[in-house]
Regions:
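Bacterial N-terminal signal peptides
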Residues: 8-19
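Extracellular/periplasmic catalytic domains that process cell-envelope and extracellular macromolecules
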Residues: 45-46, 86, 124-127, 166-168, ...
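Feature activates predominantly on carbohydrate-active enzymes
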Residues: 57-67, 71, 107-303, 333, ...
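Substrate-binding groove of N-acetylhexosamine-processing glycoside hydrolases
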Residues: 160, 294, 312, 319-479
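A cross-domain feature marking catalytic cores of carbohydrate-active enzymes
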Residues: 176-178, 226, 258-262, 306, ...
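Active-site-proximal beta-alpha loop/turn segments in soluble metabolic enzymes
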Residues: 230-231, 266-275, 305-316, 346-355
Length: 479
């Protein structure tokens, strides 16, 4: 079909006229672009406070304050004045629970707040409404701030707020499979936002923006490098570079983690062995953990991929996966660090002619007999399916086979098996099918989500982890 030239010119003119408006919506801002409300939606916020009292001072509280001021300015056209003490009249009060209760002793809390939970409450004070955003910790205050901004964006009334939210699980992390040269394994959104040319990027603006997006979703940790880890990540020079990434994450309450090569004591530590039960290897991991925490006091922990797809592991010395995990976990434990030990362990040279070769049961066969052998800060990181991240895989049987070991479910956000970012794909229904699946353990009603969150068998840690693999593309994921 031929398009008349005049029609083409009209189309081109209209597109050019609309282009400035289209560019005004930054893809980098994603869901945090805070579009101005229309007149009808904005009318209900005529009495919105003009002052925010920030009780306390920290990097995270400063982020909450700046985010609130930014969102209200764009959506409502109001400029909030920030003060450090409770003012007279209508106000927003933002701060940790102890400080807020000292300023507002009449505030009643009917339900217990846990770490990272938050309370949004509207109370009457001096004849006018005060909106309270509070939590046990600063990170919860930040999450409550994002929650209030969501309500404004949706045009929801704020006159009678009474919302207490606690997280379903303590672990809410994302992983990146970024290489030190700036490439990303299974990444479709451009080069790494963390690395280039074998070093941490000079400009970490996008890393900070990513942490902001993560915080708005309640995500509290991010491991930034490929699970097929480069041993150089633990070199003294590189640790100082990683401290810069941690500094970019810190204002948003996101803890930094890194994937490490299990063979590091030998490959870059100068030892003759990486046997996890060798005294020198044990001492090496302890010294390395101490060194990391001197540079990054709030470091989150390690991710380990061992005995899988050519990566070295404890089987080289006849040791178990628990032997390997516990040695590294004990080095991290005095500092509050976690060890995410991937259960993606199998022989990738399986002989298809052997009828007993069964990759789908490999993780269960290896880790189920070790249940109860892992230290408290070891978290087994289990892919949603027994093979990989394949579409429509059943839930991994290992979720139901661990009653005395903490675990997280590893989900794939990056579209390795769902089109590789050539088109959009709504992943939530697939994840929900797995999370809601009842594993029929001896306890009644044990869906995967309750098992990984630690609720089914009263585990201290556990939760959810997604492999994001965002990049420098404006829209992060490349779709």
């Amino acid at each position: 079909m031929r398009i008349p030239f005049r029609t083409f010119l009209l189309f081109a003119f209209c597109f050019c006229a609309l282009a400035p408006a289209l560019r005004a919506q930054s893809e980098t801002d994603a869901w945090l672009r805070y579009a101005p409300l229309d007149a009808s939606a904005k009318s209900q916020f005529q009495d919105f406070p003009g002052t925010v009292a920030v009780l306390g001072d920290s990097e995270i509280l400063r982020s909450a304050k700046s985010e609130l001021i930014r969102g209200v300015r764009v959506m409502l056209g109001k400029h909030l004045q920030a003060v450090s003490k409770l003012p007279q009249g209508r106000a927003i009060v933002l701060g940790p629970l102890a400080d807020v209760l000292a300023a507002l002793p009449s505030l009643a809390i009917q339900q217990q707040l846990v770490a990272d939970g938050y309370l949004l409450e509207t109370i009457e004070r001096d004849g006018s409404n005060t909106i309270v955003i509070t939590a046990r910790d600063d990170r919860g205050v930040l999450y409550g701030t994002f929650a209030l901004l969501r309500k404004i964006a949706l045009g929801q009334p704020l006159d009678e707020l009474h919302e207490l939210q606690n997280p379903y699980a303590p672990i809410r992390w994302v992983d990146q499979w970024d290489n030190l040269d700036g490439t990303i394994e299974r990444g479709y959104g451009g080069p790494s936002i963390f690395f280039e040319n074998g070093a941490v990027r000079a400009d970490l603006t996008r890393a900070s923006e990513f942490a902001r997006l993560l915080a708005s979703l309640g995500i509290n940790g991010c491991a930034i490098n490929n699970v097929n880890a480069d041993p150089r990540i633990l070199s003294p020079d590189f640790l100082q570079q990683l401290a810069r990434v941690a500094a970019a994450f810190r204002p948003w309450g996101v803890r930094l983690g890194v994937a490490v090569d299990f063979g590091s004591p030998k490959k870059m530590g100068g030892l003759a062995t990486f046997d996890p039960l060798d005294a020198k290897v044990i001492a090496w991991w302890k010294a390395k953990a101490d060194e990391i925490y001197r540079a990054i006091p709030d470091f989150g922990g390690f991710v380990v991929k061992a005995d899988s797809e050519g990566r070295v592991g404890p089987s080289s010395y006849g040791r178990t996966q628990a032997d390997a995990a516990n040695v590294i976990a004990r080095a991290l434990e005095p500092h509050g660090g976690l060890l995410f030990y991937r259960a993606f362990v199998y022989d990738h040279h399986l002989d298809w002619r052997n009828p007993k070769s069964d990759r789908a049961r490999a993780a269960y066969d290896i880790f189920h007999p070790l249940d109860g052998s892992f230290d408290a800060n070891v978290i087994l990181q289990i892919k949603n399916g027994p093979i990989d991240f394949q579409v429509r895989e059943p839930a991994s049987p290992l979720f139901g086979g661990l009653h005395k070991t903490s675990q997280v479910i590893e989900l794939q956000i990056t579209q390795e098996y769902t089109g590789q970012a050539r088109h959009l794909c709504f992943l939530a229904p697939m994840w929900k099918a797995t999370l809601d699946f009842d594993m029929h353990t001896p306890q009644d009603a044990t869906p995967v989500k309750a098992l990984v969150a630690g609720k089914a068998f009263d585990r201290p840690v556990g939760g959810f982890l997604g492999v994001a693999n965002v990049g420098l593309d404006d829209n992060w994921a490349g779709s």
